[in-house]
Amino acid sequence: IHATAHAVCVVLAAFGYWVAAPISLAFTTSGGVLGALYLRKRATGASRLAATHISRWLIVSVYVAAGLCYATIITH
């Protein structure tokens, strides 16, 4: 799902919809965080993802940053 959304945002950004660029960054960053947590889970043999609540807050902060980028783009 992350890859599809990322691809759509990249295509939209290529066609001049510049608001898609920060959203694409948000998808990429959240996917990277989830991937890192999954690898940590696999390496330690844990039964669930460690620090899931921290990863949720990281993902939320990335989306907030994307929203702030959008607000900056449309006001300038």
Swiss-Prot record:
Chain ranges passing through the membrane: 7-27, 54-74
GO CC, alphabetical: membrane
Domain of life: Viruses
Bilayer topology annotation: Multi-pass membrane protein
Keywords of the record: Membrane, Transmembrane, Transmembrane helix
Chief location: membrane
Subcellular localization, as worded in the UniProt entry: Membrane
Keyword Ribonucleoprotein: no
Family, similarity comment: Belongs to the alphaherpesvirinae HHV-1 UL43 family.
Identification of the protein by name: Membrane protein UL43 homolog
Organism: Equine herpesvirus 4 (strain 1942) (EHV-4)
